[in-house]
Regions:
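Non-catalytic DNA-recognition/assembly elements of restriction-modification systems
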Residues: 1-17, 149-191
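Sequence-specific dsDNA recognition surfaces
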Residues: 5-22, 34-70, 76
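A short beta-sheet element
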Residues: 32-33, 53-55, 59-121
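A short glycine-rich beta-alpha junction/loop motif
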Residues: 94-102, 134-164
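Short, positively charged
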Residues: 114-144
Length: 191
């Protein structure tokens, strides 16, 4: 199996779009650190949950998120909790990536975003990013170089799609179970 560095098969950029709103900027939906950290995928049915903020036109052009992109958290208070990822499953109008995160746009002829997201959740990647995070004590970060150096298995696209679909299906079932558990917990508190 062939492995290639992520930076060879994807475009990577680190966002600096903050949560503040300014009158002279355009309204956007912000995909924040917490959105990336907590979700396997960002879908159009989550639009109402995303924060509304503003951004400059050049920030919108640079950090707009599109179907197939993958986002990761690049900062954390602990090394073992860095580089969490999410997949952008749908095109969502005015969706922009917030700060403390990096956008990874796979080269579609080589790499599936869904597959990349699943790969970024593996223990191999978790450990790689933990060992390559810089900082001390209270804040750790992944540099653009550290993010791009991860070796990614390059399988035929159809094989990537099959593997990603199985893992996405499992994740959807986990999400349903979480919602059921949350509802049961809320019901128990009311009773």
């Amino acid at each position: 199996m062939e492995y290639r560095k992520l930076k060879e098969i994807a475009d990577i950029s680190i966002s600096n779009v903050d949560k503040k709103s300014s009158e002279n900027e355009k309204p956007v939906r912000l995909c924040n650190f917490v959105d990336v950290y907590r979700n396997w995928a960002i879908t159009e049915n989550m639009t109402e949950q995303l924060m509304v903020a503003t951004a400059k036109q050049n920030e919108i052009e640079k950090f707009a998120l599109h179907k197939g992109d993958v986002c990761i958290t690049k900062d954390s208070e602990t090394k073992d909790d860095i580089g969490m990822s999410t997949y952008i499953a749908d095109d969502i109008d005015d969706l922009v990536l917030g700060y403390h995160c990096a956008r990874i746009s796979p080269k579609k002829e080589v790499l599936s975003g869904k597959f990349l997201n699943a790969f970024l959740h593996t223990m191999f990647v978790r450990k790689f990013y933990e060992l390559n995070a810089s900082g001390s004590g209270q804040r750790y970060t992944l540099s653009l170089d550290a993010i791009g150096e991860i070796p990614v298995p390059v399988l035929p696209l159809e094989e990537q799609r099959k593997r990603a679909e199985v893992l996405s299906l499992i994740d959807r079932k986990i999400e349903v179970n979480k919602k059921i558990n949350d509802n049961l917990a809320q019901s128990a508190m009311v009773a």
